[in-house]
């Protein structure tokens, strides 16, 4: 804890933006939801892991379904599963290709990697460029599905809900035990010499 300093946390510029801005010296400390690559560390960046947070498969509150499995999620983004259990048409939302959300899904959901590449190349679904935009779009779009972190869900209680994944609820116990496998690792990113204010 430091006294005498004012901490300002601006709106999210995303992991890619935070890494770029930190590397270029525009900000002293960035927040990222993935670890640095070897190329990024070679450019003089360092990281400190500070938290893990659940990644929710989230839907607009109009969706009656409560659970998805890996196969159903892949089918939705492949355009093969087109309706919810009440017959309403699925509206799938994507994050832009370089977003850390996609890295997590490709590692943890078998088959999602090839479907994502095809989906983005064909521009099949609406693509969002920030977590805030994803959350707002989910909240106002009936029958929509997308991806948001656990902290964001609290902002739209009653408008957006998390689905169970493979029958497992996203909560602290299941994240800690590894039963719920979709989670973001959060890092502070900084240049080799950290300012006193940033420390």
Predicted regions and their residues:
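Exported/periplasmic ABC-transporter solute-binding proteins
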Residues: 1-199
